[in-house]
């Protein structure tokens, strides 16, 4: 009889500016059983982004065709662009016993939980809204209007935090990374299957 780890879907959500992308990047470095789910998007590539590595970039029409063909695990419109998670790619990774890390919002969490098992959801909170605003200003990539929008959006997203399995406050990057990794390791221990030969 062979015991085997069943692949998990691990979802990391947080308001913009909470350090979620950096946390995801570090988790992938320290855990070789994790793979990042690559989203399909209609937004324009940013400087340095590569098609098939950061995102799969598609036109509106291509995206809508994929929706019609039921190719997404979940999809949502965020600001003015569409984002979706390709079903086949995720299935392939899970089948290999790999865990798939998602960087999506509460809407995505709801639809994935509806359609899939073995989902672990983690919400990353800033220490406070004041600190979040400070972080957004320090990035110096957004104008006043965008910062206002992001702060409103952050308050809205935080109101859904209680729907998540875990909530972690990112007041110290190293400690937060450690906490999230411990959650993943513990969840793996609850999730295995065995095959009789």
Curated annotation (Swiss-Prot):
Q: Identify the PROSITE patterns for this entry.
A: GUANYLATE_KINASE_1, GUANYLATE_KINASE_2
List the molecular function annotations (GO) for this entry: ATP binding; guanylate kinase activity
Which SUPFAM superfamilies is this protein grouped with?
A: P-loop containing nucleoside triphosphate hydrolases (SSF52540)
Name a GO CC annotation attached to this entry.
cytosol
User: What residues does ATP bind to?
Assistant: 14-21
Q: State the EC number(s).
A: 2.7.4.8
Q: Does the keyword ATP-binding belong to this entry?
A: yes
Q: Which PANTHER family match?
A: GUANYLATE KINASE, GUANYLATE KINASE-RELATED
Q: What does this protein do?
A: Essential for recycling GMP and indirectly, cGMP.
Name it. Guanylate kinase
**Gene encoding this polypeptide?**
gmk
